[in-house]
Amino acid sequence: MSEDAAMHVGSLSPDGRHRWDGVTWSPVAPTPALPHLPAWASFRITARASWWVVAAALIAGLVADQAFRVGAFGLGASLALAFLALALVFVARAERLESRLLAGAAAVFAAWLSMRASPWLVWPDLAAGLILVGTAASFARRGTLLNIGMAESAARGFHAMLHWVAGAAWAVRPITAMRAPFASAAPVARGLLIATPVAIVVAALLASADPVFASFLTINLDFGQLLADAFFVLVGSLVMAGLLRSAAAEPLNRVDGPMWRLGATEGLVVLAVLDAIFAAFALAQAVAATGAAGDTLRAAAVTYADYARSGFFQLLWVAGITLVVLILFSRITALNQASTKRAFVLLAETAIVLTLLIVAVASMRLSLYESAYGFTMLRLYSHLFAGWIAVVFLLLAADVGGVFRRRRWFVGATAITALAMLMVLNFANPEALVARFNVDRAASTGKLDPQYLAGLSGDAVSTLLASRPQLQPVQFSQIKNAVCSGPMTYAPNPAAFNLADAEAASARRETC
Protein backbone atom coordinates (compact mmCIF):
# COMPACT_ATOMS: atom_id res chain seq x y z
CA MET A 1 0.00 0.00 0.00
CA SER A 2 1.41 3.35 -0.98
CA GLU A 3 1.99 6.17 1.50
CA ASP A 4 -0.86 8.19 -0.07
CA ALA A 5 -3.27 5.26 0.22
CA ALA A 6 -2.42 4.90 3.89
CA MET A 7 -3.46 8.48 4.58
CA HIS A 8 -6.86 9.05 6.17
CA VAL A 9 -9.35 11.08 4.19
CA GLY A 10 -9.31 14.67 5.44
CA SER A 11 -5.71 14.57 6.70
CA LEU A 12 -3.63 17.71 6.33
CA SER A 13 -0.21 17.80 4.71
CA PRO A 14 2.79 18.57 6.98
CA ASP A 15 2.79 22.20 5.87
CA GLY A 16 -0.99 22.50 6.49
CA ARG A 17 -1.62 23.81 2.98
CA HIS A 18 -3.24 20.67 1.40
CA ARG A 19 -5.90 18.13 2.44
CA TRP A 20 -6.11 14.44 1.31
CA ASP A 21 -9.51 13.56 -0.21
CA GLY A 22 -8.72 9.87 -0.81
CA VAL A 23 -7.51 10.39 -4.35
CA THR A 24 -5.39 13.51 -4.45
CA TRP A 25 -4.17 16.43 -2.37
CA SER A 26 -6.41 19.53 -2.64
CA PRO A 27 -5.32 23.00 -1.56
CA VAL A 28 -6.85 24.22 1.65
CA ALA A 29 -8.67 27.54 1.45
CA PRO A 30 -6.99 30.07 3.74
CA THR A 31 -8.91 30.99 6.87
CA PRO A 32 -10.17 34.54 6.48
CA ALA A 33 -8.51 36.89 8.93
CA LEU A 34 -10.75 38.47 11.50
CA PRO A 35 -11.24 42.17 10.86
CA HIS A 36 -9.26 44.42 13.15
CA LEU A 37 -11.27 46.77 15.29
CA PRO A 38 -10.40 50.44 14.91
CA ALA A 39 -8.28 51.86 17.70
CA TRP A 40 -11.20 53.85 19.11
CA ALA A 41 -13.19 50.61 19.61
CA SER A 42 -10.41 48.58 21.24
CA PHE A 43 -9.38 47.99 24.85
CA ARG A 44 -5.65 48.01 24.13
CA ILE A 45 -3.49 49.82 26.69
CA THR A 46 0.14 50.88 26.81
CA ALA A 47 0.82 50.58 30.55
CA ARG A 48 -0.09 48.33 33.45
CA ALA A 49 -1.73 49.60 36.59
CA SER A 50 0.62 50.30 39.49
CA TRP A 51 0.11 50.62 43.22
CA TRP A 52 -0.08 54.37 42.63
CA VAL A 53 -3.20 53.73 40.56
CA VAL A 54 -4.71 51.66 43.39
CA ALA A 55 -3.91 54.39 45.92
CA ALA A 56 -5.30 57.13 43.68
CA ALA A 57 -8.55 55.22 43.11
CA LEU A 58 -8.98 54.60 46.84
CA ILE A 59 -8.28 58.24 47.77
CA ALA A 60 -10.64 59.46 45.04
CA GLY A 61 -13.36 57.21 46.44
CA LEU A 62 -12.88 58.49 49.99
CA VAL A 63 -12.89 62.13 48.89
CA ALA A 64 -15.96 61.55 46.70
CA ASP A 65 -17.73 59.98 49.68
CA GLN A 66 -17.23 63.17 51.70
CA ALA A 67 -18.49 65.25 48.78
CA PHE A 68 -21.57 63.10 48.16
CA ARG A 69 -22.68 62.56 51.74
CA VAL A 70 -23.09 66.28 52.53
CA GLY A 71 -25.46 66.62 49.57
CA ALA A 72 -24.25 70.09 48.60
CA PHE A 73 -21.62 71.72 46.43
CA GLY A 74 -18.72 72.83 48.57
CA LEU A 75 -15.13 72.13 49.50
CA GLY A 76 -15.59 68.36 49.20
CA ALA A 77 -16.79 68.62 45.60
CA SER A 78 -13.91 70.95 44.73
CA LEU A 79 -11.34 68.59 46.23
CA ALA A 80 -12.85 65.54 44.53
CA LEU A 81 -12.74 67.10 41.06
CA ALA A 82 -9.34 68.70 41.62
CA PHE A 83 -7.90 65.36 42.76
CA LEU A 84 -9.01 63.77 39.47
CA ALA A 85 -7.05 66.43 37.58
CA LEU A 86 -3.96 66.13 39.79
CA ALA A 87 -3.91 62.33 39.59
CA LEU A 88 -4.12 62.54 35.82
CA VAL A 89 -0.95 64.65 35.74
CA PHE A 90 1.11 62.95 38.45
CA VAL A 91 -0.13 59.32 38.44
CA ALA A 92 -1.02 58.83 34.78
CA ARG A 93 1.92 61.09 33.90
CA ALA A 94 0.25 62.88 31.02
CA GLU A 95 3.12 63.64 28.65
CA ARG A 96 1.73 66.46 26.55
CA LEU A 97 1.51 70.09 27.64
CA GLU A 98 -2.00 70.48 26.24
CA SER A 99 -3.24 67.57 28.34
CA ARG A 100 -1.78 69.14 31.47
CA LEU A 101 -3.30 72.52 30.63
CA LEU A 102 -6.72 70.91 30.23
CA ALA A 103 -6.31 69.19 33.61
CA GLY A 104 -5.31 72.53 35.13
CA ALA A 105 -8.42 74.17 33.65
CA ALA A 106 -10.52 71.41 35.23
CA ALA A 107 -8.95 72.20 38.61
CA VAL A 108 -9.86 75.88 38.15
CA PHE A 109 -13.50 74.99 37.49
CA ALA A 110 -13.33 72.69 40.51
CA ALA A 111 -12.42 75.65 42.72
CA TRP A 112 -15.61 77.46 41.70
CA LEU A 113 -17.70 74.64 43.18
CA SER A 114 -16.86 75.93 46.65
CA MET A 115 -16.95 79.63 45.74
CA ARG A 116 -20.34 79.91 44.01
CA ALA A 117 -23.72 78.65 45.22
CA SER A 118 -25.95 79.24 42.20
CA PRO A 119 -27.19 76.02 40.55
CA TRP A 120 -26.99 77.95 37.27
CA LEU A 121 -23.20 77.93 37.76
CA VAL A 122 -22.13 74.96 39.85
CA TRP A 123 -23.74 72.31 37.64
CA PRO A 124 -22.15 73.70 34.44
CA ASP A 125 -18.86 74.01 36.36
CA LEU A 126 -19.05 70.35 37.37
CA ALA A 127 -19.87 69.28 33.82
CA ALA A 128 -17.04 71.41 32.41
CA GLY A 129 -14.57 69.98 34.91
CA LEU A 130 -15.49 66.37 34.14
CA ILE A 131 -15.38 66.97 30.38
CA LEU A 132 -12.00 68.65 30.70
CA VAL A 133 -10.40 65.81 32.70
CA GLY A 134 -11.86 63.29 30.26
CA THR A 135 -10.47 65.26 27.32
CA ALA A 136 -7.12 65.62 29.05
CA ALA A 137 -6.96 61.84 29.50
CA SER A 138 -7.82 61.29 25.83
CA PHE A 139 -5.07 63.73 24.75
CA ALA A 140 -2.51 62.39 27.25
CA ARG A 141 -0.39 60.77 24.51
CA ARG A 142 -1.69 62.14 21.21
CA GLY A 143 -4.26 64.55 19.78
CA THR A 144 -5.11 68.19 20.13
CA LEU A 145 -8.22 70.27 20.65
CA LEU A 146 -7.01 72.58 17.88
CA ASN A 147 -7.27 69.88 15.19
CA ILE A 148 -10.24 67.64 15.87
CA GLY A 149 -13.39 67.01 13.88
CA MET A 150 -16.90 65.93 14.80
CA ALA A 151 -16.24 62.26 13.99
CA GLU A 152 -13.05 62.18 16.04
CA SER A 153 -14.80 63.86 18.97
CA ALA A 154 -17.45 61.14 18.96
CA ALA A 155 -14.81 58.41 18.55
CA ARG A 156 -12.76 59.71 21.47
CA GLY A 157 -15.89 59.89 23.62
CA PHE A 158 -16.75 56.28 22.81
CA HIS A 159 -13.14 55.22 23.40
CA ALA A 160 -13.15 56.91 26.82
CA MET A 161 -16.40 55.18 27.80
CA LEU A 162 -14.94 51.77 26.90
CA HIS A 163 -11.93 52.31 29.12
CA TRP A 164 -14.00 53.75 31.97
CA VAL A 165 -16.06 50.54 31.92
CA ALA A 166 -12.88 48.44 32.04
CA GLY A 167 -11.11 50.68 34.54
CA ALA A 168 -11.92 48.68 37.67
CA ALA A 169 -10.57 45.37 36.31
CA TRP A 170 -7.38 47.14 35.21
CA ALA A 171 -6.85 49.02 38.48
CA VAL A 172 -7.10 45.93 40.73
CA ARG A 173 -4.38 44.02 38.85
CA PRO A 174 -1.68 44.86 41.44
CA ILE A 175 -3.92 43.43 44.16
CA THR A 176 -4.84 40.23 42.31
CA ALA A 177 -1.17 39.71 41.43
CA MET A 178 -0.34 39.22 45.13
CA ARG A 179 -0.93 35.45 45.06
CA ALA A 180 1.57 34.44 47.73
CA PRO A 181 0.09 36.56 50.57
CA PHE A 182 -3.41 35.45 49.61
CA ALA A 183 -2.35 31.81 49.54
CA SER A 184 -0.88 32.05 53.06
CA ALA A 185 -4.01 33.79 54.31
CA ALA A 186 -6.36 31.12 52.94
CA PRO A 187 -6.07 28.78 55.98
CA VAL A 188 -6.77 31.69 58.31
CA ALA A 189 -9.85 32.63 56.30
CA ARG A 190 -11.11 29.04 56.38
CA GLY A 191 -10.56 28.90 60.14
CA LEU A 192 -12.52 32.12 60.67
CA LEU A 193 -15.32 30.79 58.49
CA ILE A 194 -15.54 27.63 60.57
CA ALA A 195 -15.34 29.53 63.87
CA THR A 196 -18.00 32.11 63.00
CA PRO A 197 -21.16 30.04 63.68
CA VAL A 198 -19.67 28.62 66.89
CA ALA A 199 -18.68 32.10 68.10
CA ILE A 200 -22.14 33.49 67.33
CA VAL A 201 -23.92 30.77 69.33
CA VAL A 202 -21.56 31.02 72.32
CA ALA A 203 -21.65 34.83 72.37
CA ALA A 204 -25.45 34.83 72.19
CA LEU A 205 -25.72 32.45 75.15
CA LEU A 206 -23.27 34.47 77.24
CA ALA A 207 -25.05 37.71 76.38
CA SER A 208 -28.38 36.27 77.53
CA ALA A 209 -26.75 35.19 80.80
CA ASP A 210 -24.85 38.41 81.60
CA PRO A 211 -26.14 41.93 80.75
CA VAL A 212 -22.68 43.45 81.26
CA PHE A 213 -21.21 41.13 78.65
CA ALA A 214 -24.20 41.87 76.42
CA SER A 215 -23.36 45.58 76.54
CA PHE A 216 -19.94 44.78 75.08
CA LEU A 217 -21.65 43.37 71.99
CA THR A 218 -23.87 46.39 71.39
CA ILE A 219 -22.70 48.10 68.19
CA ASN A 220 -24.34 51.33 67.12
CA LEU A 221 -24.01 51.25 63.36
CA ASP A 222 -26.10 53.10 60.82
CA PHE A 223 -26.16 50.40 58.18
CA GLY A 224 -28.00 52.68 55.76
CA GLN A 225 -25.24 55.29 55.96
CA LEU A 226 -22.63 52.52 55.79
CA LEU A 227 -24.10 51.23 52.53
CA ALA A 228 -24.33 54.78 51.16
CA ASP A 229 -20.67 55.42 52.04
CA ALA A 230 -19.62 52.17 50.38
CA PHE A 231 -21.53 53.14 47.24
CA PHE A 232 -20.04 56.64 47.16
CA VAL A 233 -16.50 55.28 47.61
CA LEU A 234 -17.14 52.78 44.83
CA VAL A 235 -18.38 55.47 42.44
CA GLY A 236 -15.41 57.75 43.10
CA SER A 237 -12.94 54.89 42.75
CA LEU A 238 -14.50 53.71 39.49
CA VAL A 239 -14.36 57.20 38.01
CA MET A 240 -10.68 57.55 38.91
CA ALA A 241 -9.81 54.06 37.66
CA GLY A 242 -11.56 54.70 34.36
CA LEU A 243 -9.86 58.06 33.95
CA LEU A 244 -6.38 56.62 34.56
CA ARG A 245 -6.99 53.68 32.24
CA SER A 246 -8.22 56.07 29.55
CA ALA A 247 -4.94 57.98 29.87
CA ALA A 248 -3.01 54.68 29.57
CA ALA A 249 -4.97 53.52 26.50
CA GLU A 250 -3.39 53.11 23.10
CA PRO A 251 -3.26 56.61 21.57
CA LEU A 252 -5.72 57.41 18.83
CA ASN A 253 -4.70 58.71 15.45
CA ARG A 254 -6.82 60.99 13.30
CA VAL A 255 -10.40 59.73 12.92
CA ASP A 256 -12.31 60.86 9.85
CA GLY A 257 -16.03 60.64 9.23
CA PRO A 258 -17.75 57.92 7.17
CA MET A 259 -17.00 57.73 3.47
CA TRP A 260 -20.69 57.91 2.57
CA ARG A 261 -21.74 61.27 1.22
CA LEU A 262 -25.08 62.87 0.45
CA GLY A 263 -25.55 64.03 -3.12
CA ALA A 264 -24.75 67.65 -3.84
CA THR A 265 -28.21 68.31 -5.27
CA GLU A 266 -29.94 67.06 -2.13
CA GLY A 267 -27.74 69.18 0.11
CA LEU A 268 -28.26 72.29 -2.00
CA VAL A 269 -32.04 71.80 -1.98
CA VAL A 270 -32.10 71.56 1.83
CA LEU A 271 -30.14 74.80 2.20
CA ALA A 272 -32.24 76.56 -0.45
CA VAL A 273 -35.44 75.66 1.42
CA LEU A 274 -33.97 76.96 4.68
CA ASP A 275 -32.89 80.20 3.01
CA ALA A 276 -36.36 80.69 1.54
CA ILE A 277 -38.04 80.25 4.93
CA PHE A 278 -35.59 82.61 6.63
CA ALA A 279 -36.02 85.20 3.88
CA ALA A 280 -39.79 85.07 4.38
CA PHE A 281 -39.28 85.57 8.12
CA ALA A 282 -37.05 88.58 7.47
CA LEU A 283 -39.75 90.01 5.20
CA ALA A 284 -42.33 89.48 7.96
CA GLN A 285 -40.16 91.42 10.40
CA ALA A 286 -39.86 94.30 7.94
CA VAL A 287 -43.62 94.35 7.35
CA ALA A 288 -44.34 94.31 11.10
CA ALA A 289 -41.83 97.09 11.75
CA THR A 290 -43.52 99.38 9.21
CA GLY A 291 -46.94 98.82 10.76
CA ALA A 292 -48.34 97.20 7.62
CA ALA A 293 -49.22 94.05 9.57
CA GLY A 294 -51.69 95.81 11.86
CA ASP A 295 -54.73 94.02 10.42
CA THR A 296 -53.04 90.64 10.83
CA LEU A 297 -52.15 91.33 14.46
CA ARG A 298 -55.65 92.61 15.25
CA ALA A 299 -57.18 89.51 13.68
CA ALA A 300 -54.98 87.39 15.94
CA ALA A 301 -55.99 89.54 18.96
CA VAL A 302 -52.33 90.42 19.55
CA THR A 303 -51.05 93.92 20.19
CA TYR A 304 -47.76 95.01 18.66
CA ALA A 305 -46.25 95.24 22.16
CA ASP A 306 -47.21 91.63 22.88
CA TYR A 307 -46.00 90.60 19.43
CA ALA A 308 -42.63 92.25 19.98
CA ARG A 309 -42.20 90.55 23.36
CA SER A 310 -43.13 87.01 22.29
CA GLY A 311 -41.51 84.10 20.52
CA PHE A 312 -37.91 84.56 21.64
CA PHE A 313 -37.50 80.97 22.88
CA GLN A 314 -38.87 79.59 19.62
CA LEU A 315 -36.46 81.79 17.67
CA LEU A 316 -33.52 80.49 19.70
CA TRP A 317 -34.66 76.93 19.01
CA VAL A 318 -34.71 77.74 15.30
CA ALA A 319 -31.15 79.05 15.55
CA GLY A 320 -29.98 75.93 17.36
CA ILE A 321 -31.62 73.57 14.87
CA THR A 322 -30.19 75.54 11.95
CA LEU A 323 -26.72 75.32 13.45
CA VAL A 324 -26.97 71.52 13.68
CA VAL A 325 -28.27 71.25 10.11
CA LEU A 326 -25.52 73.44 8.67
CA ILE A 327 -22.77 71.59 10.53
CA LEU A 328 -24.15 68.20 9.50
CA PHE A 329 -24.67 69.02 5.82
CA SER A 330 -21.32 70.78 5.51
CA ARG A 331 -19.72 67.46 6.57
CA ILE A 332 -21.78 64.90 4.65
CA THR A 333 -22.53 66.63 1.35
CA ALA A 334 -20.42 65.53 -1.62
CA LEU A 335 -18.97 68.72 -3.11
CA ASN A 336 -16.70 67.30 -5.79
CA GLN A 337 -17.24 70.01 -8.38
CA ALA A 338 -16.15 73.60 -7.98
CA SER A 339 -19.54 74.93 -9.09
CA THR A 340 -21.51 72.90 -6.54
CA LYS A 341 -19.04 73.85 -3.83
CA ARG A 342 -19.44 77.55 -4.60
CA ALA A 343 -23.22 77.19 -4.60
CA PHE A 344 -23.15 75.36 -1.26
CA VAL A 345 -20.92 77.99 0.33
CA LEU A 346 -23.19 80.77 -0.97
CA LEU A 347 -26.35 79.12 0.37
CA ALA A 348 -24.72 78.23 3.70
CA GLU A 349 -23.37 81.74 4.23
CA THR A 350 -26.79 83.17 3.33
CA ALA A 351 -28.42 80.87 5.88
CA ILE A 352 -25.91 81.99 8.51
CA VAL A 353 -26.57 85.68 7.84
CA LEU A 354 -30.34 85.18 8.02
CA THR A 355 -29.99 83.09 11.19
CA LEU A 356 -27.96 85.86 12.79
CA LEU A 357 -30.89 88.14 11.96
CA ILE A 358 -33.19 85.71 13.77
CA VAL A 359 -30.85 85.68 16.78
CA ALA A 360 -30.86 89.49 16.82
CA VAL A 361 -34.66 89.56 16.69
CA ALA A 362 -34.85 87.02 19.52
CA SER A 363 -32.47 89.07 21.65
CA MET A 364 -34.43 92.27 20.95
CA ARG A 365 -37.73 90.63 21.88
CA LEU A 366 -36.22 89.25 25.05
CA SER A 367 -34.95 92.70 26.01
CA LEU A 368 -38.45 94.13 25.58
CA TYR A 369 -39.86 91.31 27.68
CA GLU A 370 -37.32 91.99 30.43
CA SER A 371 -38.19 95.69 30.39
CA ALA A 372 -41.83 94.79 30.98
CA TYR A 373 -41.51 91.90 33.44
CA GLY A 374 -38.04 92.07 34.97
CA PHE A 375 -34.96 89.91 34.88
CA THR A 376 -34.64 86.22 35.76
CA MET A 377 -31.80 83.75 35.49
CA LEU A 378 -33.53 81.98 32.60
CA ARG A 379 -33.86 85.25 30.66
CA LEU A 380 -30.26 86.20 31.38
CA TYR A 381 -28.99 82.82 30.22
CA SER A 382 -31.19 83.06 27.12
CA HIS A 383 -29.43 86.34 26.30
CA LEU A 384 -26.06 84.71 26.87
CA PHE A 385 -26.98 81.71 24.74
CA ALA A 386 -28.07 84.03 21.94
CA GLY A 387 -24.72 85.82 22.08
CA TRP A 388 -22.74 82.58 22.21
CA ILE A 389 -24.62 80.96 19.34
CA ALA A 390 -24.03 84.10 17.27
CA VAL A 391 -20.29 83.67 17.86
CA VAL A 392 -20.55 79.99 16.88
CA PHE A 393 -22.33 80.96 13.65
CA LEU A 394 -19.51 83.38 12.85
CA LEU A 395 -17.00 80.58 13.45
CA LEU A 396 -19.04 78.29 11.21
CA ALA A 397 -19.14 80.96 8.50
CA ALA A 398 -15.34 81.11 8.59
CA ASP A 399 -15.10 77.31 8.53
CA VAL A 400 -17.48 76.95 5.58
CA GLY A 401 -15.66 79.77 3.82
CA GLY A 402 -12.38 77.83 3.96
CA VAL A 403 -10.46 79.66 6.70
CA PHE A 404 -7.57 77.43 7.89
CA ARG A 405 -8.80 74.73 5.53
CA ARG A 406 -6.04 72.27 6.43
CA ARG A 407 -6.98 72.10 10.11
CA ARG A 408 -10.18 70.90 11.76
CA TRP A 409 -10.44 73.81 14.16
CA PHE A 410 -14.21 74.46 14.40
CA VAL A 411 -15.01 71.96 17.19
CA GLY A 412 -12.12 73.08 19.37
CA ALA A 413 -12.84 76.76 18.82
CA THR A 414 -16.50 76.26 19.73
CA ALA A 415 -15.56 74.39 22.91
CA ILE A 416 -13.06 77.07 23.90
CA THR A 417 -15.65 79.84 23.48
CA ALA A 418 -18.13 77.91 25.67
CA LEU A 419 -15.53 77.34 28.40
CA ALA A 420 -14.40 80.97 28.23
CA MET A 421 -17.98 82.20 28.61
CA LEU A 422 -18.54 79.93 31.62
CA MET A 423 -15.32 81.17 33.23
CA VAL A 424 -16.37 84.79 32.71
CA LEU A 425 -19.75 84.00 34.25
CA ASN A 426 -18.07 82.61 37.34
CA PHE A 427 -16.15 85.83 37.80
CA ALA A 428 -19.18 88.01 36.97
CA ASN A 429 -21.58 86.22 39.36
CA PRO A 430 -24.78 86.07 37.25
CA GLU A 431 -27.21 85.92 40.18
CA ALA A 432 -25.70 89.12 41.55
CA LEU A 433 -26.15 90.64 38.07
CA VAL A 434 -29.83 89.65 38.00
CA ALA A 435 -30.29 91.11 41.48
CA ARG A 436 -28.59 94.36 40.42
CA PHE A 437 -30.65 94.61 37.22
CA ASN A 438 -33.89 94.14 39.15
CA VAL A 439 -32.86 96.70 41.77
CA ASP A 440 -32.07 99.25 39.05
CA ARG A 441 -35.40 98.53 37.38
CA ALA A 442 -37.23 98.93 40.70
CA ALA A 443 -35.50 102.25 41.31
CA SER A 444 -36.65 103.59 37.93
CA THR A 445 -40.09 101.97 37.55
CA GLY A 446 -41.11 101.05 41.09
CA LYS A 447 -41.73 97.43 39.99
CA LEU A 448 -40.17 94.73 42.15
CA ASP A 449 -40.62 90.98 42.64
CA PRO A 450 -39.19 90.27 46.11
CA GLN A 451 -40.37 86.65 46.11
CA TYR A 452 -38.27 85.81 43.05
CA LEU A 453 -35.26 87.62 44.49
CA ALA A 454 -35.66 85.69 47.74
CA GLY A 455 -35.33 82.46 45.77
CA LEU A 456 -31.85 83.34 44.51
CA SER A 457 -28.86 81.64 46.11
CA GLY A 458 -26.24 83.04 48.44
CA ASP A 459 -24.48 84.55 45.42
CA ALA A 460 -27.07 87.36 45.34
CA VAL A 461 -27.61 88.05 49.05
CA SER A 462 -24.83 90.61 49.53
CA THR A 463 -25.94 92.55 46.43
CA LEU A 464 -29.57 92.63 47.55
CA LEU A 465 -28.79 93.75 51.10
CA ALA A 466 -26.47 96.48 49.77
CA SER A 467 -29.27 98.02 47.66
CA ARG A 468 -30.70 100.27 50.42
CA PRO A 469 -29.41 103.57 48.89
CA GLN A 470 -31.05 102.85 45.52
CA LEU A 471 -34.53 101.84 46.70
CA GLN A 472 -37.45 103.38 48.47
CA PRO A 473 -37.75 102.31 52.13
CA VAL A 474 -40.83 100.21 51.36
CA GLN A 475 -39.06 98.41 48.53
CA PHE A 476 -35.93 97.71 50.57
CA SER A 477 -38.11 96.49 53.44
CA GLN A 478 -39.67 93.94 51.08
CA ILE A 479 -36.24 92.72 49.98
CA LYS A 480 -34.95 92.66 53.54
CA ASN A 481 -37.90 90.63 54.82
CA ALA A 482 -37.48 88.13 51.98
CA VAL A 483 -33.70 87.76 52.18
CA CYS A 484 -33.32 87.86 55.96
CA SER A 485 -35.39 84.70 56.35
CA GLY A 486 -32.24 82.76 55.49
CA PRO A 487 -29.66 81.54 58.02
CA MET A 488 -27.52 84.12 59.82
CA THR A 489 -25.03 81.61 61.17
CA TYR A 490 -22.87 79.32 59.10
CA ALA A 491 -21.10 76.32 60.61
CA PRO A 492 -21.30 73.54 58.00
CA ASN A 493 -19.47 70.26 57.69
CA PRO A 494 -16.03 71.13 56.25
CA ALA A 495 -16.86 69.19 53.09
CA ALA A 496 -19.95 71.38 52.58
CA PHE A 497 -18.20 74.72 53.11
CA ASN A 498 -19.15 77.23 50.42
CA LEU A 499 -17.71 80.74 50.33
CA ALA A 500 -20.86 82.29 48.82
CA ASP A 501 -23.07 80.86 51.57
CA ALA A 502 -20.61 82.03 54.23
CA GLU A 503 -20.62 85.57 52.82
CA ALA A 504 -24.44 85.51 52.62
CA ALA A 505 -24.72 84.58 56.30
CA SER A 506 -22.25 87.34 57.20
CA ALA A 507 -24.26 89.91 55.19
CA ARG A 508 -27.46 88.87 56.99
CA ARG A 509 -25.81 89.27 60.40
CA GLU A 510 -24.67 92.79 59.51
CA THR A 511 -27.90 94.05 57.90
CA CYS A 512 -30.88 92.05 59.16
Predicted feature locations:
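Signature of WW domains and closely related Tyr/Trp-rich beta-sheet microdomains
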Residues: 1-33
